[in-house]
Amino acid sequence: MAIMSDKWIKEAVINQSMISPFAEKQVRVHNKEKIISYGLSSYGYDARVSNEFKIFTNINSTTVDPKNFSEYNLVDREVDVCIIPPNSFALGRTIEYFKIPRDVLVICVGKSTYARCGIIVNVTPLEPEWEGHVTLEFSNTTPLPAKIYANEGACQFLFLKSDQICDTSYADRQGKYMKQVGVTLPLT
């Protein structure tokens, strides 16, 4: 597997609609204000988080169960700045919609701007032929409230192209998160 360059990413966007919307260069300023960057980089793509968040709460005294997940664990917010309570967790989603080619696996890493503030972004790999909005998991590891800025960069996707096509893609096995739109909760 090889990591793919900005040139390859641009071609995949043009020929396969791999990322939509797509920023062809790094965007660091919006309306004359500095922002957390997003857009195409040398060997990846920095995606933005939308203004749709689900923040974990304990007001309903529920238990987090991945096999029987309750929406009562969360508070929904549509905001420009999401404040995650200390040592807590929130879900968001990318603005960008991804369509992954059959011979590509995508890995996501966090942005250093957030990591240096104790905010960790986690995403499981985007598998071959998966498509949808990516649900982002934000963990505030600090004892202080932490801000996540909607419509700004949140994470970087790295595209790994295989020299072999997989026998069974995510689409072939009808994966449960296929074509997800919005913040998607755990499914079993």
Swiss-Prot record:
Enzyme Commission number: 3.5.4.13
Q: Which PANTHER family match?
A: DCTP DEAMINASE
Question: What protein does this entry describe?
Answer: dCTP deaminase
Q: Which amino acid positions bind dCTP, per UniProt?
A: K111, S112, T113, Y114, A115, R116, T135, L136, E137, Q156, Y170, K179, Q180
Family membership: Belongs to the dCTP deaminase family.
What this protein is reported to do is described as:
Catalyzes the deamination of dCTP to dUTP.
From the record, give the transmembrane residue ranges.
Answer: none
UniProt-listed GO biological process terms: dUMP biosynthetic process; dUTP biosynthetic process
This protein's record includes keyword Metal-binding: no
Q: Do you know which HAMAP family this protein is assigned to?
A: dCTP_deaminase
Q: Which reaction does it catalyse?
A: dCTP + H2O + H(+) = dUTP + NH4(+)
Pfam families for the chain: DCD
Instruction: Read off the InterPro entries from this record.
Output: dCTP_deaminase, dUTPase-like_sf, dUTPase_trimeric
Q: Which residues form the signal peptide?
A: none
Extract the GO molecular function terms from the UniProt entry: dCTP deaminase activity; nucleotide binding
Q: In which pathway does it act?
A: Pyrimidine metabolism; dUMP biosynthesis; dUMP from dCTP (dUTP route): step 1/2
Name the source organism. Answer: Rickettsia akari (strain Hartford)
Record's subunit section:
Homotrimer.
Highest rank taxon of the organism = Bacteria
**Which keywords does this Swiss-Prot/TrEMBL entry list?**
Hydrolase, Nucleotide metabolism, Nucleotide-binding
Name the catalytic site residues.
E137
